[in-house]
Amino acid sequence: MNEEYVIQMKGIRKIYPNGVVANQDVDLNVRKGEIHALMGENGAGKSTLMKMLFGLEQPTEGEIYVNGEKVHLSSPNVAISKGIGMVHQHFLLVPSLTVAENIVLGMTPKKNGIFIDRQKAIKITEEYSKKFNLAVDPNARVVDIPVGMKQKVEILKALVRGAKILILDEPTAVLTTQETTELFKELKHLKEQGYTLIFISHKLNEIMEITDRLSILRGGKFMGVYETKDVTPEKISRLMVGRDVVLQVQKDVAKPTDEILRVRDLHYVNDWGKKMLNGVSLSVRKGEILGIAGVEGNGQKELVDMLFGLNKPNEGTITMKGDNIIGLNQRQLREKHISLVPEDRMLFGIAANASIEENIISDRADSKKMNKGLMFNMKNMHEETDALIKEYKVLCKSRDQKVGMLSGGNIQKVVVAREFSNQPDLIIADQPTRGIDVGATEFIRKKLVELSRSGIGVLLVSADLNEVMELSDSLIVMYGGQIVAYFEDTSQLNDEIMGQYMLGIKKQTAEEIARVCHE
């Protein structure tokens, strides 16, 4: 095989038992010491291809070579033994353990063969941290560290196990602009030391900045490999989706009217005794998108959980059109015409083993339209499901296909098809485009703007700073469980201004922040 490449995947085909073809004769050639992007829409076959490279799945056909040697990667342990490591999008860390304990987990050093040698674990962590310029606190509990440090812990875990080839799955999905900049410096340092990085991302600006070459998949097929410097973001988008993509949403000036959601003086202490919300107050009005920005872990999740009915505050009030909604369950919230797009679509957004139709109709199955006497009106159910599949461009075999068999982007389209189509007065959208491709992102962003301009109130929570600045009509920033800034006009904002508030460097006066209550 060609010694230029540390990874060669040749003629890879993956067909699942249900007949779904995830990869069709895909070739992937990765050079030593390069940062190589793997791109494609959700459902294009990227994840499947990387699962095979990391030994999580087996190809139906094809060959894999690592450093010129033909290999059978029957498990992650085999892949690790060949110098391959994977940093997953959703971190696989134990929150209650320290950074050092997480890094050596599974290969924990022992004293006298019995007791955990914590000092040695700390020493290993410090040694690798220094060697690779990945600054972490070995003694900190993972539950208490910021997201950016968790990312470094995951990378160190792979490096400690001898990885020379790192697969990075959406590594910046939950990072701030500053954390992303820092991560890129660290990745370039790894590259300079001869490490090879496979970088999976939907963020075209990052691909252009950090990668040397890129391979593109579409519909499970290999569309080509390119030198990054020779292509434009527009060309990449066309190769990924087969058409031009416009991520910058055109929107009219918002004309908000009545207050629809009122949150006042929310306080919440979590099970570890940490104060996660400290006097949060805000209002959402009809016809506007109110965005919430901030580094994850600063109270956004706790706030959204309360609005979703998953938790209750220790103090404070939440009302919808004047009615208290604290303590209401999901069904009762829907009766208040609140639609919910959860951050974790797999856990809270769908029933994976149910069909597309069952998932889409689940919130309206007891409506008059969907019932005929004591029986379901199957004709109306089929028609509504098919219409939404068409409108929201859900790529599927049929309405009867299990949702769990769809790609991430198409699962998200099923969620938003249900939530956006049920005549809501308020949409709470938590990370609505996280981990989905540019085509699905474009569609969902346009829909949110379209719905807000029809008079619906939208509360948008997003870790994607560009997204939250572009879509929001007004914007709050959360830090340390508090609102530290409110911007009534987002047109003059930039990453640098936002970053200062998101990292707690700056805070507006109480009077400036109070404007978000519109009283």
Task: Spell out what each predicted region is.
Residues 2-519:
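Glycine-rich phosphate-binding loops of nucleotide-dependent enzymes
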